[in-house]
Swiss-Prot record:
<feature type="binding site">
    <location>
        <position position="262"/>
    </location>
    <ligand>
        <name>[4Fe-4S] cluster 2</name>
    </ligand>
</feature>
<dbReference type="InterPro" id="IPR050105">
    <property type="entry name" value="MoCo_biosynth_MoaA/MoaC"/>
</dbReference>
<dbReference type="GO" id="GO:0061799">
    <property type="term" value="F:cyclic pyranopterin monophosphate synthase activity"/>
</dbReference>
<comment type="function">
    <text>Catalyzes the cyclization of GTP to (8S)-3',8-cyclo-7,8-dihydroguanosine 5'-triphosphate.</text>
</comment>
<dbReference type="Pfam" id="PF04055">
    <property type="entry name" value="Radical_SAM"/>
</dbReference>
<keyword id="KW-0479">Metal-binding</keyword>
<dbReference type="InterPro" id="IPR013785">
    <property type="entry name" value="Aldolase_TIM"/>
</dbReference>
<keyword id="KW-0004">4Fe-4S</keyword>
<keyword id="KW-0411">Iron-sulfur</keyword>
<dbReference type="GO" id="GO:1904047">
    <property type="term" value="F:S-adenosyl-L-methionine binding"/>
</dbReference>
<feature type="binding site">
    <location>
        <position position="64"/>
    </location>
    <ligand>
        <name>S-adenosyl-L-methionine</name>
    </ligand>
</feature>
<dbReference type="Pfam" id="PF06463">
    <property type="entry name" value="Mob_synth_C"/>
</dbReference>
<feature type="binding site">
    <location>
        <position position="27"/>
    </location>
    <ligand>
        <name>[4Fe-4S] cluster 1</name>
    </ligand>
</feature>
<feature type="binding site">
    <location>
        <position position="20"/>
    </location>
    <ligand>
        <name>[4Fe-4S] cluster 1</name>
    </ligand>
</feature>
<feature type="binding site">
    <location>
        <begin position="250"/>
        <end position="252"/>
    </location>
    <ligand>
        <name>GTP</name>
    </ligand>
</feature>
<dbReference type="GO" id="GO:0051539">
    <property type="term" value="F:4 iron, 4 sulfur cluster binding"/>
</dbReference>
<keyword id="KW-0342">GTP-binding</keyword>
Length: 308
């Protein structure tokens, strides 16, 4: 499906829970401010089934921390049984060592691990948890079982800016495929922490100089730089960036049962909780959810636009 701004809808991002065992001071919470209502596995898979009918072929599981859901493996398995080409997950990595093999067997294709520091001290300052070594072990386990490409997310801010290039070195040593250097943006807790925002221009300019190739990713038109080691560094700058919004191909299912068309906005969401929890047959629910998706596509628009 194509929205009225010519953007294809290709990716479904599902928030499985708001609960997290870390306390990152900038967490954007997927742009959600509602209660931590947990949709059932059946609810999630029904929405995913309808989304698949609209041509969506990729699902990203997020949180909170998705590995805290006891039915995570079953959800992954169900998504693959629906025929999704790509099922991935973003995690803090705390429980990954124990879950990596089970998730791989269930059909998880790849994984993003949030690692916002390269030292135990900075890691604890950012997350509130002394778990740096445990997360590193989780990353190694993901690589070992074949959850590739393994990508690391690093939200750049004034507390960790000096660790960026050591983070690149660590990533190369770990053997990960790709890292994302992400701009802190004012969503969720990031609204309160935006004073820690740090401009990525100087960092990106240096990375471009040392790279051997530059690419532009279709999603969000993000710049990607291939280093001599083969590591890919992707720079993610969503804030006040109309180019980023012009390349958005996502729709989100919130933890409290809403179709969210934009990370930054709460004024154009479609509440589908009553459909999911209503006393309807599954066929009727599918029809009503299909209508909800049509409305969501119709009202979907970039948050940041070019001013002409």
């Amino acid at each position: 499906m194509i929205d009225r701004f010519g953007r294809p809808l290709e990716d479904l991002r599902i928030t499985l829970t708001h609960v997290c065992n870390f306390e990152c001071f900038f967490c954007h919470m997927e742009g959600e401010e509602g209660d931590n209502y947990i949709l059932s596995k059946e609810d999630i898979l029904l929405v995913a089934k309808v989304a698949k009918n609209f041509g969506i072929n990729s699902v990203k599981l997020t949180g909170g921390e998705p590995t805290l859901r006891r039915d995570l493996v079953e959800i992954v398995r169900g998504l693959k049984q629906l025929g999704y080409r790509d099922v991935s997950m973003t995690t803090n990595g705390f429980l990954l060592k124990d879950l990596a093999y089970k998730l791989k067997l269930a059909g998880l294709d790849r994984i993003n691990v949030s690692l916002h520091a390269i030292s135990r001290e900075t890691f604890k300052k950012i997350t509130g948890v002394d778990a740096f070594d445990r997360v590193i072990e989780g990353i190694k386990s993901a690589i070992d079982v074949g959850l590739v490409p393994v990508k690391l997310n690093f939200v750049v801010n004034r507390r960790n800016r000096e660790e960026v290039f050591k983070f690149i070195e660590l990533s190369q040593n770990l053997g990960v495929n790709e890292i994302h250097l992400i701009e802190l943006h004012p969503v969720g807790l990031g609204k309160l922490a935006f004073k820690e925002h740090d401009d990525l221009r100087e960092i990106e300019e240096y990375i471009e100089k040392i790279s051997i190739k530059k690419q532009i990713r279709k999603k969000h038109f993000r710049p990607r730089y291939v280093l001599p080691s083969g590591l890919i560094v992707e720079v993610v700058k969503p804030y006040a960036n109309p180019i980023f919004c012009a390349g958005c191909n996502r729709i989100r299912l919130s933890v409290d049962g809403k179709l969210k068309t934009c990370l930054y906005r709460e004024d154009n969401v479609i509440d589908i909780l009553d459909i999911l929890k209503g006393e309807y047959s599954e066929d009727v629910k599918e029809e009503l959810l299909g209508r909800a998706f049509m409305i969501a596509i119709a009202i979907r628009e970039p948050n940041f636009k070019y001013k002409i």
